Design a protein with these regions (language model features):
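Conserved phosphate- and dinucleotide-binding cores of soluble alpha/beta proteins
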Residues: 4-33, 48-62, 78, 87-90, ...
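Cofactor-pocket helix-loop regions in the catalytic cores of large enzyme subunits
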Residues: 25-29, 49, 313-324
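N-terminal low-complexity or amphipathic/hydrophobic leaders
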Residues: 42-44, 49-64, 322-369
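Flexible, glycine/charged-enriched surface loops at secondary-structure junctions
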Residues: 46, 223, 319-322, 334-340, ...
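Short active-site oxyanion
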Residues: 67-69, 334-337, 514-517
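A conserved C-terminal secondary-structure "cap"
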Residues: 254, 283, 542-596
Length: 600
């Protein structure tokens, strides 16, 4: 199938080029990726475990183009596939992990061994660089995250004369893409492309690329697109080639066609690089395709049935439950809470608050793409499906950055950090092991920006030790630079707090001494135990208390309604234990889906 194409003038390396009208619009996946050439600057669509163009990337890896520059907010599975085929010479990114499945091994090895070049960007600077390309400008202003050292020695990023003492403005140079590869739910016969649900950075990056390559679940007649709630239609004028590829995002999700297959994801992420997964068939195919039809009410009913069939849990609260409940108590009806990547503990605390004392809290999920979700249980693949049904606002990550983050509207984004020092500076970039080895971490994502912008800077560690709570971090990925109420008001920010909760106790930040102070110890924990697990001289509050235990009623809601699978526990166990626990949670969710669909 082909179509008569309209001439469109697009940029490549500063030179205006004319698209070749004679090349076919609809092609095979193998032909689609043949348009990627050695040295291309390539961007990848989707977000986290949502709508990743994995079929196209596996086909691209099989061709083994060389010297690619991978330019994307996130790395994850797409970057692992391309690194495994030795395609990548440079990475421009904000964050890279395998989400709930752990660290990204090839990304870590490449940066630790120096086999690829890389640029690590704060999220706002990265989106500003893409926005400059989208608007055909040389640069775009952004608020410099003053509490991070990410931009230290970055001569390519100038400072604006509009900077002030309170607000430093940087100028991000434009970032053009030679190729953008994405997966979509539907396209029409003319080449218009429709995406639904959380958009990642797709609606920004697609307008920065010289060549746009799309795989899609299905093709429909002209006039069919744009009628689904919160869908976004990319005009055919910016789309170059399309391959119709059912399951083109599998085993990640492509709603409403199918949810993510977490069992398959566990298999492919356990191998490096991730292999091509077998196409789902039989019951597995039916499960992921039928699950998006399930309603909140049906899931609540099924959870209640499952809970009623198991033994009552009257055990005392565990440390994960104490931490979740403490975090939830910080949330009110007026709160706006954003969920970062790989944060089961944080999301559980938001949902617990919504289920108990703060029913009107607004929660943003899936990289900010799903805003103000309805209450639902803490789940894996089903969580995104339910959130997509309920979120009244579905947008791109850059949209929530502008609408919420830069406006200072977000109350908190509860975030974990591998290293935190006495001054509440965090490090998710890299650490040095006790043996002196450089250990690469996933990166800060957007922490560098939100440390100042959100009202509260809320941190957590689930396994406090002298290696994680240190005198001084090896790198400062994020910290709050604008601290006092007067400074924050002058900078147009909401005054707030800096707090840390660990598996041993809770800390508050004392501005006068610029340090974290132990404010409470968890039940059964002594100050001496905390001191022994702290890498700096511990200061204890004169008003030290014991962290309150959650009430029996709150515990029941947490265990039976909010987190019946126990996903909050995933952040409290070793890597080996995590694999086993995650497998149990995946199996439990698959059973839940089967019951909800009346299969058992």
């Amino acid at each position: 199938m082909s179509a008569v194409r309209r001439q469109v003038r697009k940029r490549r390396g500063g030179v205006v080029a004319v698209r070749d009208q004679d090349k076919p619009l609809f092609v095979s996946v193998d032909e689609l990726v043949s348009y990627v050439t050695d040295g291309d600057r390539i961007g990848v669509g989707g977000a986290l475990l949502t709508r990743l163009p994995l079929s196209a990337l596996h086909a691209l890896a099989a061709r083994r183009p060389k010297e690619l520059q991978y330019i994307s907010w996130g790395g994850g599975i797409p970057l692992e596939i391309l690194l495994g085929a030795d395609c990548v010479a440079k990475i421009v990114f904000c964050f890279s992990s395998l989400d709930i499945f752990g660290l990204a091994p090839l990304f870590r090895r490449a940066l630790e061994e120096g086999t690829v070049q890389y640029e690590e960007w704060p999220a706002f600077a990265f989106t500003a660089a893409l926005e400059a390309s989208k608007q055909n400008l040389p640069s775009m202003p952004f608020r410099v995250p003053r509490g991070s050292d990410l931009l230290t020695n970055r001569s390519d990023i100038a400072r604006s004369p509009d900077s002030s003492v309170e607000v430093e403005i940087g100028l991000a140079p434009r970032r053009d893409l030679d190729v953008f590869v994405m997966h979509a739910q539907r396209v029409d016969e003319a080449g218009n492309v429709e995406i639904c649900g959380a958009r990642g950075m797709d609606t920004l990056a697609v307008f920065c690329a010289h060549t746009v390559l799309v795989t899609a679940e299905e093709v429909v007649p002209v006039g069919e697109l744009g009628h689904l709630r919160d869908s976004f239609v990319i005009p055919r004028d910016v789309v170059d080639h399309i391959a119709i590829e059912p399951y083109g995002a599998y085993p990640t999700s492509c709603l409403p066609h199918y949810i993510a297959d977490f069992a398959c994801l566990a298999d492919v992420t356990s191998v490096s690089p991730p292999p091509v997964p077998p196409r789902p068939t039989g019951a597995a195919s039916e499960r992921i395709r039928e699950a998006p039809t399930l309603t909140h009410q049906r899931i609540r009913e099924t959870v209640a049935e499952v809970v009623a069939a198991r033994a009552a849990n009257d055990a005392p609260p565990t440390i994960d439950e104490i931490m979740v409940c403490w975090l939830a108590q910080r949330i009110s009806n007026e709160s706006i809470c954003s969920a970062g990547a790989v944060s089961p503990l944080a999301v559980t605390s938001y949902l617990l608050a919504k289920a108990t004392h703060a029913p009107h809290v607004s929660i943003m999920m899936t990289s900010g793409g799903l805003v103000d979700i309805a209450l639902r249980p803490m789940l894996l693949a089903l969580g995104e499906a339910l959130d997509t049904k309920s979120a009244p606002v579905q947008c791109g990550g850059e949209d929530t950055y502008r609408w919420y983050y830069q406006q200072g509207r977000v109350t908190c984004e509860v975030v974990a950090s591998a290293q935190i020092d006495r001054h509440a500076r965090t490090n998710n970039i890299e650490v040095t092991s006790p043996k002196g080895r450089r250990v690469r971490l996933p990166g800060q994502g957007g922490m560098a920006d939100v440390a100042d912008l959100h009202r509260d800077f809320v941190l957590y560690q689930t396994r406090q030790s002298t290696l994680s709570l240190v005198e001084s971090v090896d790198r400062v990925s994020a910290s709050r630079a604008v601290k006092s109420a007067s400074e924050r008001e002058t900078a147009g920010l909401v005054p707030g707090e800096i707090v840390l909760v660990t598996n041993l106790g809770c800390y508050e930040y004392d501005m006068a001494s610029d340090e974290l102070v132990l404010a409470s110890v968890h039940p059964g924990v002594s100050v001496e135990e905390v001191r022994a697990a702290t890498g700096f001289e511990l200061r204890v509050s004169d008003h030290l208390v014991v962290t309150p235990l959650p009430s029996p009623a709150t515990l029941r809601v947490l265990r039976d309604e909010v987190d019946p699978l126990g996903l909050r526990r995933l952040e409290f166990v070793s890597a080996q234990e995590r694999t086993t626990l995650l497998a149990e949670c995946i199996e439990a969710e698959e059973d839940l889906i089967a019951r909800a669909l009346h299969w058992v």
